[in-house]
């Protein structure tokens, strides 16, 4: 019994917010160093996951107790293919999330996604060469 993918939103061209990082604007303005450190740690985690398969599988095995090696392998392959090397926030994903949220909270449809979207931290880290430096090692 292996990993059974029921649907691939990417293959169908459906934008879906599956992995998001959210914080308050107040936090980003009062403690930008913390936000940057968090994002760098996240990016290092993505790097390790994508480049150290054995370590990644060991962590998955620990937390997905009882999963067969086949399921772990297939999950790893699927996840690495879907995971962005540079996790820029996507206006399209945020808009899609607001659309889904509007089914339960109609006022979400009125929210301007630009008001809750900030790529400046990821852009600054990316432009600093931090991410490229990880993958050069």
Positions of the model-derived regions?
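Conserved C-terminal helix/tail region of periplasmic/extracytoplasmic solute-binding proteins
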Residues: 102-137
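Secondary-structure end/capping motifs
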Residues: 30-111
């Amino acid at each position: 019994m292996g990993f059974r993918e029921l649907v691939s939103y990417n293959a169908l061209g459906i934008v879906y917010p599956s992995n998001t990082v959210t914080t308050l604007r107040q936090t980003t303005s009062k403690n930008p160093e913390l936000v940057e450190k968090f994002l760098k740690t996240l990016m290092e985690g993505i790097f390790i996951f994508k480049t150290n398969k054995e370590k990644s599988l060991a962590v998955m095995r620990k937390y997905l107790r009882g999963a067969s090696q086949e399921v772990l392998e297939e999950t790893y392959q699927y996840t690495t293919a879907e995971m962005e090397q540079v996790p820029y926030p996507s206006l399209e994903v945020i808009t899609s999330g607001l659309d889904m949220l509007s089914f339960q909270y109609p006022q979400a449809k009125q929210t301007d996604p630009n008001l809750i979207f900030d790529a400046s931290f990821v852009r600054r880290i990316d432009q600093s060469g931090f991410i490229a430096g990880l993958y050069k090692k």
